[in-house]
Amino acid sequence: MDKILILDFGSQVTQLIARRVREAHVYCELHSFDMPIEEIQAFAPKAIILSGGPNSVYESDYQADPKLFELGVPVLGICYGMQFMAQTLGGKVESGDKREFGYAQIKARHHSKLLEGLQDQIDDAGNGFLDVWMSHGDKVTQLPAGFQVIAETPSCPYAAMADEARGFYGVQFHPEVTHTKRGTEMIHRFVLHVAGCKPSWTMPNYIDEAVKKIREQVGDEEVILGLSGGVDSSVAAALIHRAIGDQLTCVFVDHGLLRLNEGKMVMEMFAQNLGVKVVHVQAEADFMAKLAGETDPEKKRKIIGAEFIEVFDRESGKLTNAKWLAQGTIYPDVIESAGAKTKKAHTIKSHHNVGGLPEDMNLKLLEPLRELFKDEVRQLGVALGLPHDMVYRHPFPGPGLGVRILGEVKKEYADLLRQADAIFIEELRNTVDEKTGKNWYELTSQAFAVFLPVKSVGVMGDGRTYDYVVALRAVVTSDFMTAHWAELPYSLLGRASNRIINEVRGINRVVYDVSGKPPATIEWE
């Protein structure tokens, strides 16, 4: 199978490069810029992509091994990656007079395999222009030998460069972001035409390979998996069960912070429909006791994570034959974990299920989804026969409703929130947008209700009420790195509000969150 290697110099959007490559049905992996040349050779990439990054090429701490340019494979340098390529191969990089951040238009020059025929506009003289996204201060001021300029802007005469003979290309802009309109085509052109990769990275092929790999790893030993009801653990369970059947036992911990009827749905789908062995643990009282009195969001996450591990450890200890612990770790988790280890990533919110496993568990780790992005996990779930509605549900945080209840978590609050959230989701599913023919659940990327621990005065019937408030949140995003609040129809919001206030005793006011990300995050905690 053909593979692309992406070396990460610390850009905030490096994952998007991998996404674009995978969209061409070509397998790729993302590794740190300082990956030893011996490991690069062992990986045997068909081509290499150098990411952008926040640093200057003059900082010696951020240099890849220059021998990568001697491997005889095409290389694409993006932003910092272009500057590193230019400097390493004998060109010059200097601090620019003008910094370029945001939208820019580049003018294509000469013919190149990378850009030929791609344009967003053409001027009267017949010159092609591309709309791109820039984010740089330094710039290339002298090309290395063998290179020619293939694009320019008024303030950046070398906006893109190429050495066609060696298959080396550099672009000062970011083709991986959606703001660069033809960026995906550029990356696909590099991967498929310049590098000559075959588009063989498909779900049927992946399933066959994964099943074979799991059987080779596990042999006749037993595996346990913590089933949360979320997409990742559910798909991991279905894949492992296809590979080894009854050698898999799932432990489903109901911490009392799940969505309405979620526990019942999980048991029906896995235990009854798929025939997976599932141990159902009712642990609501344990979690509520540990969370009592705690209001800090980060501490709540850690309490929920620690308690989940404790309960899971206790239950899995009863399965004395288990030698493997399976997890629904996906590729972004792996990338973020690696970034944290090298101090290149800042902790925004801690992941309750990454890292904190007991050291004395003595179990080998099985992570069959660790090479997949979220959209690929969903495709895999459908290919494995999981219900489409379940696989394409909106994201749900690991700590569940624990971080959608502001402040202290109580059973009373969770019960109210569960009902309100279910009504909101039902109204989204039942309301169809006439322009697109899709319902509003499909048109939003994530939607949920948030419980606010404040009371407001209301009037119901002839009496005064003093009850709780819930906020509704719905966003639209392509990558969850930025998001816009969803402009839902007033009629939909009105129905949802009316139903929540009338059907959920204890709530008398509903508000809608119109904050984008940034400055707000999608979740409230």
UniProtKB/Swiss-Prot annotation:
Pathway: Purine metabolism; GMP biosynthesis; GMP from XMP (L-Gln route): step 1/1. Residues 3-200 form the Glutamine amidotransferase type-1 domain. The active site is at residues 79, 174, 176. Its EC number is 6.3.5.2. GO terms for cellular component: cytosol. HAMAP family: GMP_synthase. This is GMP synthase [glutamine-hydrolyzing]. It comes from Chromobacterium violaceum (strain ATCC 12472 / DSM 30191 / JCM 1249 / CCUG 213 / NBRC 12614 / NCIMB 9131 / NCTC 9757 / MK). The gene is guaA.
